[in-house]
C-alpha cells in the first residue's frame, strides 16, 4: 500500500510541477491576419523601470524553464509627448513582425491615443499597430528617453501599448523553443537632446555582439555606384518587364545624355511557382537570352553598373519545393510551413547565400536590391530556433555580399533582426513607397523618411525611395 501511495504522490507532483508548463504553448506559425497582441506569456512581477536606467541593454535573468514568452510591465517617466514606432494594422492584413517598409512614426501626447479608433491614421494606410519596435519620449524634465526592442541569440522583444496607455515588454522565441534563463530586454538611453540620445544608444548597441552585428555608417564602405544617378524599372513598369523593354530603355538612356550610371532591374524577372522561387535564372519567356544581351550594354563611361532585385528568402513566399537548384544546395534547405527555407544550422544557411550571391555575380550583376527582408522571420516562425535562423540569413547575406565585393540595397527590412544586422551594407529603405500627385502622402512620406533616419541613419544611409521631377506636389 505504501508503494502505491508513493507512486500516486509522484504522479501528483509530476502533474503539478511538470505538466502545466507544457499547457498553453503558443503556436507562433505566421499567417496573414494573425495578430500577436497580448500573446500568451508568463507574466513577470518585477517592473522594467525606465525612470532609473542602470544599463543601456538590461537583461532578464532567472527565467523559469520551459517558458516560450515572458511579459514585463514597463514603468515610464513623466512625459510631454512622444513617438511610437510600429507598422500600421488592419483586420486580415499582415501584422508585426512583418514590418516591411512600414516602421511608421506615430505621434502622441498620451500613449492611449494610439488605441483610440479616432486616431488619424497615415493617408491611404491603416491605424497604428500597438505592437512596435521603439519608443521616443520628450520628458517633463526636458530630457529625452529612447527605448528600442532587441534580439538575443534566439529571442526577440517588442513593445505593446495597452488600452490604458501603459506599456508591456514581451520577449519570446516565436517558436517551439524555450527562452534561455537570461535574455536581453531592450536598448535604453536618456539624454538632453534627441540626436545625441539616439546616437549614444546605438553606440551601445554596436558593442553588444549578442544583440546586434552593426557598424556606424561612417565606418563602412559606400558602394560606388550609389554615388551616381541611377534608373530603376519599377516605377515605370512595375513587374511588367522583359528583355526588349530594358534594352530599349538602356539605349534611350545612353542617347539622352542624362548621366545615369547604373540600372536596377526590379521585380518581374524571377522564375517562380506560386510566388516561391524555382531558381536563380530569369523567366525564360521574358528573358530568352538570360542576362547576356543586357549585360553587353554596360560601358565604363555610360551605364557602368547593373543591379538586380531579389527577395532575402528567394521570392515573396520563400523557395519552391519544385526548384532547379543543384543537389548540394537542396541539401541546405528544409521544409517548414509550406515553404523551403535555408537551414537548419548556420553552415547550411551560409552555403545557400554563398550560392545565391555567387550565381548572380557570375551572371554579371554588380549589386543586389534584396527586398522582403522583414518577411524572412515570419517564414521561420513556429519552428525551432526561428529567430536564430532568420538572423543567420541576414548575417550570411551580408558576409557573402562583402566577400564577393558586391553592393547591397536593403528593402522592406524594418524589423529588428534586419535593422540590427547590417554589418557591411550601407543603404536601407526608410520609407514606404512614394506616391505621385498626393499632398497628404507626400507629407507622410517625408515625415516617415526623416524620422526613421534618426534610428536607421545611425548605421546606414537612408534610402527615401524616390521623388519625381514631374510631381507637381513634391517634385
In which residue ranges do the predicted regions lie?
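Glycan-recognition surfaces
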Residues: 318-351, 355-361, 398-475
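Bacterial Sec-dependent N-terminal signal peptides
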Residues: 1-26
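Short boundary motifs at domain starts and secondary-structure transition points
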Residues: 213-224
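Preference for well-ordered, secondary-structure-rich cores of eukaryotic proteins
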Residues: 97, 103-170, 272-287, 291-297, ...
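Alpha-helix-loop-beta-strand connector modules within alpha/beta enzyme cores
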Residues: 294-298, 389-408
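Functionally engaged cysteine thiol sites
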Residues: 87-88, 240, 409-413
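Aromatic-lined carbohydrate-binding/catalytic grooves of carbohydrate-active enzymes
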Residues: 224-387
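N-terminal accessory beta-strand-rich subdomains and adjacent acidic, glycine-rich linkers
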Residues: 26-208
Amino acid at each position: 500500500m505504501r508503494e502505491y501511495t508513493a507512486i500516486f504522490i509522484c504522479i501528483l507532483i509530476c502533474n503539478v510541477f511538470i505538466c502545466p508548463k507544457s499547457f498553453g504553448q503558443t503556436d507562433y506559425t505566421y499567417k496573414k491576419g494573425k495578430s500577436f497582441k497580448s500573446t500568451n506569456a508568463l507574466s513577470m512581477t518585477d517592473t522594467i523601470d525606465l525612470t532609473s536606467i542602470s544599463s543601456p541593454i538590461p537583461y532578464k535573468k532567472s527565467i523559469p524553464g520551459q517558458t516560450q514568452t515572458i511579459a514585463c510591465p514597463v514603468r515610464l517617466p513623466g512625459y510631454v509627448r512622444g513617438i511610437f514606432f510600429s507598422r500600421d494594422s488592419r483586420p486580415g492584413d499582415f501584422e508585426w513582425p512583418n514590418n516591411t517598409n512600414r516602421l511608421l512614426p506615430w505621434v502622441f501626447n498620451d500613449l492611449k491615443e494610439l488605441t483610440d479608433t479616432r486616431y488619424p491614421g497615415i493617408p491611404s494606410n491603416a491605424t497604428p499597430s500597438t505592437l512596435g519596435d521603439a519608443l521616443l519620449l520628450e520628458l517633463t524634465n526636458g530630457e529625452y528617453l529612447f527605448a528600442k526592442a532587441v534580439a538575443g541569440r534566439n529571442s526577440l522583444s517588442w513593445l505593446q501599448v495597452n488600452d490604458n496607455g501603459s506599456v508591456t515588454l514581451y520577449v519570446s522565441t516565436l517558436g517551439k523553443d524555450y527562452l534561455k534563463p537570461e535574455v536581453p530586454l531592450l536598448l535604453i538611453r536618456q539624454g538632453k537632446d534627441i540626436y545625441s540620445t539616439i546616437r549614444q544608444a546605438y553606440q551601445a548597441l554596436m558593442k553588444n555582439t549578442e544583440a546586434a552585428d552593426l557598424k556606424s555608417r561612417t565606418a563602412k564602405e559606400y558602394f560606388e555606384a550609389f554615388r551616381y544617378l541611377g534608373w530603376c524599372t519599377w516605377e515605370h513598369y512595375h513587374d511588367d518587364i522583359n528583355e526588349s523593354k530594358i534594352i530599349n530603355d538602356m539605349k534611350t538612356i545612353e542617347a539622352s545624355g542624362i548621366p545615369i550610371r547604373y540600372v536596377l532591374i526590379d521585380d518581374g524577372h524571377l522564375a517562380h511557382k506560386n510566388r516561391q522561387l524555382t531558381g536563380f535564372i530569369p523567366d525564360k519567356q521574358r528573358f530568352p537570352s538570360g542576362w547576356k544581351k543586357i549585360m553587353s550594354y554596360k560601358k565604363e563611361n555610360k551605364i557602368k553598373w547593373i543591379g538586380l532585385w531579389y527577395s532575402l528568402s528567394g521570392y515573396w513566399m520563400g523557395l519552391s519545393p519544385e526548384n532547379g537548384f543543384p543537389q548540394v544546395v537542396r541539401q541546405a534547405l528544409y521544409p517548414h510551413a509550406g515553404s523551403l527555407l535555408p537551414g537548419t544550422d548556420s553552415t547550411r544557411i551560409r552555403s545557400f547565400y554563398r550560392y545565391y550571391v555567387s550565381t548572380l555575380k557570375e551572371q554579371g550583376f554588380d549589386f543586389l536590391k534584396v527586398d522582403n527582408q522583414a518577411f524572412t522571420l515570419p517564414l521561420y516562425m513556429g519552428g525551432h530556433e526561428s529567430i536564430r535562423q532568420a538572423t543567420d540569413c541576414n548575417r550570411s547575406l551580408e558576409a557573402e555580399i562583402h566577400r564577393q565585393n558586391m553592393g547591397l540595397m536593403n528593402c522592406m527590412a524594418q524589423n529588428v533582426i534586419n535593422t540590427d544586422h547590417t554589418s557591411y551594407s550601407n543603404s536601407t529603405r526608410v520609407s514606404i513607397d512614394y506616391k505621385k500627385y498626393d499632398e497628404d502622402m507626400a507629407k507622410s512620406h517625408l515625415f516617415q523618411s526623416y524620422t526613421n533616419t534618426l534610428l536607421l541613419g545611425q548605421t546606414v544611409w537612408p534610402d527615401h525611395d524616390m521623388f519625381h521631377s514631374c510631381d507637381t506636389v513634391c517634385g
